């Protein structure tokens, strides 16, 4: 949400309750009751301490040595943002300068440094997912890490793996990698590894169930919608990518705005304490989304570690649920000292684990202004001023990776008569504003809150300013010697058509975050539906009525309906270029004119009609009471539901053509680890965690320092009368039902980052030889799907679990691809035993290999043979 959304919310939250010591907030008093659908989130206390895994041992040892000597003020400082507009970044914590810990800078976005300059605007997550290329996923993460580090950013607010794409109209689906748990998991994990290899803390988000933008937030008049998710669906679909992100060592998790099973994500003890920190072994820190904290004591007890941007119910008032109120809650005993110590230790341990105690730059940019100088704290009156932007160029040669991703993501859906690739001297007529520039200027719309010119990304906090943009119009004009351009969304009546002319029609479909409404779409695609914007369907039909050869180029945030024109005889080819970022033009012409064969594959299903989806995944509108978004479709999202309902889509998940052809041969399956039991072996025990004195600190530790120069509305940890706060310790805080300070037994499904380490034992390895049988060079993707036996109960008939992409193969050459399948990959979540259940020795499991979910080329049966289909 970030800065603009905070301003937009001020009016709607004006009558909200402000923070108060030891009190519940706007909505938290209601969160323990069951909702109308019967879903509830059982309590799980206390919050587990971090530091019990050997992979984080060194970082926690360093953090312990520092935290044990911190004052209460220093500890609180690191848990609470300084307030919106109270520093250079979209969020910053207070500091602990005695120990060398500065204000930690937190900044968007998953595709580039937001509200900055001289940075790369990479392709969006959905584009990266369409590459089905793990190396490019990792490379983008590395270069994002380099750029964020170069700007002095400690915490990158990405990647996004939630929403997962359950709702095809969902506004922020494009920030993630595709509508499948494994595709999201692999894309997220590779990105995290890349980012953190550069010493920047990655943040996996939004945890969890934020599948719709409208009504995601609570305010005084309306609770956020509740995503009602059963235990098995939660584990097998929505938690899957988070578990893999945690296994990759992610340093931070961001909670979602919405509720899950009637409890706000930022204070849902089941989600944070039990699942995230205990079962999945998360060792980093949990932060809120911006203004997504709804209570003070309640959120601390439930496992929240950092409040962002720090403000309470209404931003810019200088009030907070934490900050000085957290100091008060420690002094009066409402929040145990041990909980605060763990909160701070988690934050400091992540800082050490990324090596940020070394030569790490301070922020050298401002997300508040593009001017060189200005207020240091724009949210305050009479702020001191200084240099706020140093215009550090962090782009290096990252345009190469950006172009490669955008190019390798381009997905060829149709290519009748092999009309593509085009020849440089073909007579081209290019139509559509999506081919050209934004007439108002490159970055004229804040947070890309408009659809003008070529669509490079959606809108909202997940965006970045474009340092430059090569449009398709520019790139085509640079290559083609015979192209005419009609940058309009209305087909010109006076276009002359000659024999052999090719019409290239550009259309788009946009979406974004809820705080901006674009052309009647408040984030989600409410007005446009799944159709092209700006009369795109009509533009294609008009061109097809006049030209005998039409190529359609689609820039889209997700599934888009094509039925009005896809079967017209003149429509020869369709390319989906997704959201390509700054290299939109060059990446397209690389493929359009045949320098590269297209190798992208759909990261979602394209339906024939929106009615192909069940009503449960439609957008929900405002009722009189809280919206109940119940996941009645369960495990069956996207291609899974099409398979179950026996609905043939227009184009299936994973579909993507090439200018050449490929064969799959010599499939083999080998056993790596014998699965001798239904459930994994007993988890390893937890190791020791840091220990600290538990006595309540002296109140003087949060007294205002003498001669301290206060910044108005800046959030400090200090109290005017700390001694008085300590005296109120006799009052009993109304703790949530089920609250206890007695630790729970360790969940049997846990034991390491991501869960029981035995879950990630490689059970099988599958190899297949891919041969280029065509006449042009190209790359192929082998997609691996599992089919589980009936003995495990009802499961989707095919589930993507792995994929691999060849290098560029010359005609007649081959490459053998090998993919590994873990115990977890062939397991289901047992809701009774609360553990992952797999067939012994994998009996009955089938492993399918193909180029889409409906284009299978080979199959292996565990315990049987492999064969080519």
Swiss-Prot record:
<keyword id="KW-0624">Polysaccharide degradation</keyword>
<keyword id="KW-0732">Signal</keyword>
<keyword id="KW-0378">Hydrolase</keyword>
<dbReference type="GO" id="GO:0005576">
    <property type="term" value="C:extracellular region"/>
</dbReference>
<feature type="signal peptide">
    <location>
        <begin position="1"/>
        <end position="19"/>
    </location>
</feature>
<feature type="glycosylation site" description="N-linked (GlcNAc...) asparagine">
    <location>
        <position position="261"/>
    </location>
</feature>
<keyword id="KW-0326">Glycosidase</keyword>
<dbReference type="GO" id="GO:0009251">
    <property type="term" value="P:glucan catabolic process"/>
</dbReference>
<feature type="active site">
    <location>
        <position position="289"/>
    </location>
</feature>
<dbReference type="Pfam" id="PF01915">
    <property type="entry name" value="Glyco_hydro_3_C"/>
</dbReference>
<dbReference type="InterPro" id="IPR026891">
    <property type="entry name" value="Fn3-like"/>
</dbReference>
<protein>
    <recommendedName>
        <fullName>Probable beta-glucosidase F</fullName>
        <ecNumber>3.2.1.21</ecNumber>
    </recommendedName>
</protein>
<feature type="glycosylation site" description="N-linked (GlcNAc...) asparagine">
    <location>
        <position position="364"/>
    </location>
</feature>
<dbReference type="InterPro" id="IPR036881">
    <property type="entry name" value="Glyco_hydro_3_C_sf"/>
</dbReference>
<dbReference type="InterPro" id="IPR050288">
    <property type="entry name" value="Cellulose_deg_GH3"/>
</dbReference>
<feature type="region of interest" description="Disordered">
    <location>
        <begin position="677"/>
        <end position="697"/>
    </location>
</feature>
<keyword id="KW-0119">Carbohydrate metabolism</keyword>
<comment type="pathway">
    <text>Glycan metabolism; cellulose degradation.</text>
</comment>
<dbReference type="Pfam" id="PF00933">
    <property type="entry name" value="Glyco_hydro_3"/>
</dbReference>
<dbReference type="Pfam" id="PF14310">
    <property type="entry name" value="Fn3-like"/>
</dbReference>
<feature type="glycosylation site" description="N-linked (GlcNAc...) asparagine">
    <location>
        <position position="728"/>
    </location>
</feature>
<keyword id="KW-0136">Cellulose degradation</keyword>
<dbReference type="InterPro" id="IPR036962">
    <property type="entry name" value="Glyco_hydro_3_N_sf"/>
</dbReference>
<feature type="glycosylation site" description="N-linked (GlcNAc...) asparagine">
    <location>
        <position position="332"/>
    </location>
</feature>
<comment type="similarity">
    <text>Belongs to the glycosyl hydrolase 3 family.</text>
</comment>
<feature type="glycosylation site" description="N-linked (GlcNAc...) asparagine">
    <location>
        <position position="399"/>
    </location>
</feature>
<keyword id="KW-0964">Secreted</keyword>
<dbReference type="InterPro" id="IPR019800">
    <property type="entry name" value="Glyco_hydro_3_AS"/>
</dbReference>
<dbReference type="InterPro" id="IPR002772">
    <property type="entry name" value="Glyco_hydro_3_C"/>
</dbReference>
<dbReference type="GO" id="GO:0030245">
    <property type="term" value="P:cellulose catabolic process"/>
</dbReference>
<comment type="function">
    <text>Beta-glucosidases are one of a number of cellulolytic enzymes involved in the degradation of cellulosic biomass. Catalyzes the last step releasing glucose from the inhibitory cellobiose.</text>
</comment>
<dbReference type="InterPro" id="IPR013783">
    <property type="entry name" value="Ig-like_fold"/>
</dbReference>
<keyword id="KW-0325">Glycoprotein</keyword>
<feature type="compositionally biased region" description="Pro residues">
    <location>
        <begin position="681"/>
        <end position="691"/>
    </location>
</feature>
<dbReference type="InterPro" id="IPR017853">
    <property type="entry name" value="Glycoside_hydrolase_SF"/>
</dbReference>
<feature type="glycosylation site" description="N-linked (GlcNAc...) asparagine">
    <location>
        <position position="77"/>
    </location>
</feature>
<feature type="glycosylation site" description="N-linked (GlcNAc...) asparagine">
    <location>
        <position position="478"/>
    </location>
</feature>
<dbReference type="InterPro" id="IPR001764">
    <property type="entry name" value="Glyco_hydro_3_N"/>
</dbReference>
<dbReference type="GO" id="GO:0008422">
    <property type="term" value="F:beta-glucosidase activity"/>
</dbReference>
């Amino acid at each position: 949400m970030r800065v603009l959304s905070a301003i937009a919310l001020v009016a709607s939250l004006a009558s909200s309750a402000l923070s108060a010591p030891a009190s519940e907030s706007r909505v938290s008093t209601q969160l323990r009751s069951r909702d109308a659908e019967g879903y509830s989130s059982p309590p799980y206390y206390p919050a587990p301490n971090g530091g019990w895994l050997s992979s984080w041992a060194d970082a926690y040892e360093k953090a312990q040595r520092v935290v044990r000597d911190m004052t209460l003020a220093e500890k609180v400082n690191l848990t609470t943002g300084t307030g919106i507009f109270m520093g250079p970044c979209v969020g910053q914590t207070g500091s602990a300068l005695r120990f060398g810990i500065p204000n930690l800078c937190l900044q968007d976005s998953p595709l580039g440094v937001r509200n900055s300059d001289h940075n790369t605007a990479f392709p969006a997550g959905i584009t990266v997912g369409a590459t089905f290329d793990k190396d490019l996923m990792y490379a983008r993460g590395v270069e994002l890490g380099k750029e964020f580090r170069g700007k002095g950013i400690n915490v990158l607010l990405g990647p996004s793996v939630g929403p997962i794409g359950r709702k095809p109209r969902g506004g922020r689906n494009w920030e993630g990698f595709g509508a499948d748990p494994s595709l999201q998991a692999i894309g997220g994990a590779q990105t995290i590894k890349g980012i953190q290899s550069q010493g920047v803390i990655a943040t996996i988000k939004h945890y969890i169930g934020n599948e719709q933008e409208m009504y995601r937030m609570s305010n005084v008049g309306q609770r956020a919608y509740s995503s009602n998710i059963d235990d098995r669906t939660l584990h097998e679909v929505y938690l899957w990518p988070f578990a893999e992100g945690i296994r990759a060592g992610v340093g931070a998790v961001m909670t979602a705005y919405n509720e899950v099973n009637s409890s706000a994500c930022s204070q849902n003890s089941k989600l944070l304490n039990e699942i995230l920190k205990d079962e999945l072994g998360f060792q980093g820190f949990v932060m809120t989304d911006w203004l997504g904290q709804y209570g003070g004591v309640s959120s601390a007890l439930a496992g929240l570690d950092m409040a962002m941007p720090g403000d309470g119910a209404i931003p810019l008032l200088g009030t907070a649920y934490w900050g000085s109120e957290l100091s008060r809650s420690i002094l009066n005993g409402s929040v145990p000292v041990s909980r605060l110590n763990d909160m701070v230790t988690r934050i400091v341990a992540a800082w050490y684990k990324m090596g940020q105690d070394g030569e790490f730059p301070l922020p050298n940019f401002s997300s508040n202004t593009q001017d060189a100088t200005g207020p240091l704290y724009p949210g305050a009156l009479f702020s001191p001023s200084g240099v706020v932007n140093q215009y550090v160029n962090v782009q290096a040669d990252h345009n190469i990776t950006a172009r490669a991703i955008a190019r390798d993501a381009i997905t060829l859906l149709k290519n009748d008569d092999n009309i593509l690739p085009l020849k440089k001297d073909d007579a081209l007529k290019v139509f559509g504003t999506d081919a050209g520039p934004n007439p108002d200027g490159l970055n004229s719309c804040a947070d890309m809150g408009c659809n003008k010119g070529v669509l490079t990304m959606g809108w909202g906090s997940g965006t970045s300013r474009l340092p430059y943009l090569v449009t398709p119009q520019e790139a085509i004009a640079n290559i083609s010697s015979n192209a005419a351009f009609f940058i309009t969304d209305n087909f010109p009546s006076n276009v002359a058509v000659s024999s052999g002319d090719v019409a290239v029609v550009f259309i788009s479909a946009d979406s974004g975050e809820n705080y901006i409404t674009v052309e009647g779409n408040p984030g989600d695609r409410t007005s446009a539906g799944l159709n092209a914007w700006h009369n795109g369907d009509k533009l294609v039909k008009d061109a097809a009525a006049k030209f005998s050869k039409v190529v359609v180029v689609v820039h889209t945030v997700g599934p888009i309906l094509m039925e009005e024109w896809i079967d017209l005889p003149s429509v020869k080819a369709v390319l989906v270029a997704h959201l390509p970022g700054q290299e939109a033009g060059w990446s397209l012409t690389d493929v359009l004119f045949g320098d590269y064969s297209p190798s992208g594959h759909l990261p979602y299903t394209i339906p024939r009609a929106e009615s192909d989806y069940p009503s449960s995944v439609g957008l929900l509108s405002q009722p009189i009471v809280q919206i109940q978004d119940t996941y009645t479709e369960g495990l069956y999202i996207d291609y899974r539901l099409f398979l179950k309902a026996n609905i043939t889509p227009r184009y299936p998940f994973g579909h993507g053509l090439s200018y050449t052809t490929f064969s799959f041969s010599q499939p083999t399956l080998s056993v790596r680890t014998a699965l001798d039991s239904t459930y994994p072996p007993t988890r390893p025990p937890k190791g020791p965690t840091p220990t600290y004195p538990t006595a309540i600190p002296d109140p003087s530790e949060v007294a205002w320092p003498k001669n301290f120069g206060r910044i108005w509305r800046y959030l400090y940890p200090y109290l005017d009368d700390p001694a008085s706060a300590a005296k109120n310790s006799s009052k009993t805080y109304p703790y949530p039902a089920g609250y206890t300070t007695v630790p729970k037994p360790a969940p049997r499904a846990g034991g390491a980052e991501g869960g029981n380490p035995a879950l990630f034992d490689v059970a099988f390895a599958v190899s297949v030889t891919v041969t280029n049988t065509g006449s042009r060079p190209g790359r192929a993707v082998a997609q691996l799907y599992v089919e589980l036996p009936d003995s495990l109960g009802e499961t989707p008939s095919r589930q993507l679990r792995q994929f691999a992409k060849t290098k560029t193969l010359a005609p007649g050459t081959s490459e053998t691809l090998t993919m590994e399948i873990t115990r977890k990959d062939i397991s289901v979540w047992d809701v009774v035993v609360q553990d992952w259940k797999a067939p012994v020795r994998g009996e009955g499991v089938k492993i399918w290999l193909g180029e889409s979910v409906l284009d299978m080329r080979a199959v292996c049966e565990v315990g049987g043979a492999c064969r080519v289909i």
